[in-house]
Amino acid sequence: MVEEIVKEINLFAAEREWNQFHTPKNIASSIIIESAELLECFQWQDPTISDVVEDIKLLESVEEEIADVMIYSLRLCSLLGRDPIEIMRAKLEKNAEKYPVSESKGSAKKYSDL
């Protein structure tokens, strides 16, 4: 499933001859920009999960920005020859070590403050 969408993303860029612009720095910058646009969906409000799900317009905006962040993230993985699933699993393992359940359960503290 991930491989299929990565192929679609790469084809989308290739058809438009955008590969020349897709440097690691440019893609990383785009991830930050799209992440900021995701955050902008919540500017001056702090909705609950159910608030977001029930507000169709807000939910659609959030989905669009999540998609942009994920597309650029998958594109960067592809450009660097990295498997996004392997990268995420490795990071989850590291996070499990940093945030053991016994010390972090119910806590918002950073691992260095546990």
Predicted region positions:
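Flexible "arm" and connector segments at domain edges
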Residues: M1-I66, M70-L114
